[in-house]
């Protein structure tokens, strides 16, 4: 668990830096699993950027883990237009959607036997990079001014036709609105 007041207000970059520092401090790893995105910023960028800070491969939108080995993991990932099967070398980081797995609740006996004292809490002083200017709001190259839902628009147009016809129609709309 990484927790310190100086981590507050972090954007994607500062959050990813914080996570990578905590992961490095935790020791060796083979596979890091991250959720696809958060409910606050909803950017789906923290996992990939954390992997970049760690210098390891990453796979996004993982639908299923097909095979694991000592040095690799084979996954199915959603690339929006197609589903791709990819064999990735370990260590790597994968971002998964909430539907990739349904976690089981521990049994009563197992809950009684859990050692909750084994959860280590790390703060700024426990990390390799102890510069508070690299974390939280101070370490964030971007700052959110405000978050709001977009206005609902009812003036949408659905176009049908061949690729050429659609391209011509789209160009006409862009010209009409002086985008081109």
Give residue ranges: language-model regions:
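N-terminal glycine-rich FAD/FM-binding segment characteristic of electron-transfer flavoproteins
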Residues: 1-180
């Amino acid at each position: 668990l990484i927790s310190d007041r100086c981590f507050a207000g972090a954007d994607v970059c500062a959050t990813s830096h914080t996570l990578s520092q905590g992961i490095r401090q935790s020791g060796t790893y083979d596979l890091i699993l991250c959720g696809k995105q958060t409910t606050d910023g909803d950017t789906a960028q923290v996992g990939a950027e954390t992997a970049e800070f760690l210098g390891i491969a990453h796979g996004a939108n993982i639908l299923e883990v097909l095979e694991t080995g000592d040095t690799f993991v084979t996954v199915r990932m959603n690339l929006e237009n197609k589903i791709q099967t990819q064999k990735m070398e370990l260590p790597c980081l994968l971002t998964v959607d909430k539907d990739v797995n349904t976690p089981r609740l521990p049994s009563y006996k197992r809950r009684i036997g859990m050692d909750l004292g084994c959860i280590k809490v790390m703060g700024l002083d426990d990390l390799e990079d102890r510069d508070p200017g690299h974390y939280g709001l101070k370490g964030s190259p971007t700052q959110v001014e405000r978050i709001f839902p977009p206005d609902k628009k009812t003036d949408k147009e659905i176009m049908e036709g061949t690729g050429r016809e659609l391209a011509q129609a789209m160009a006409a709309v862009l010209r009409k609105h002086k985008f081109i």
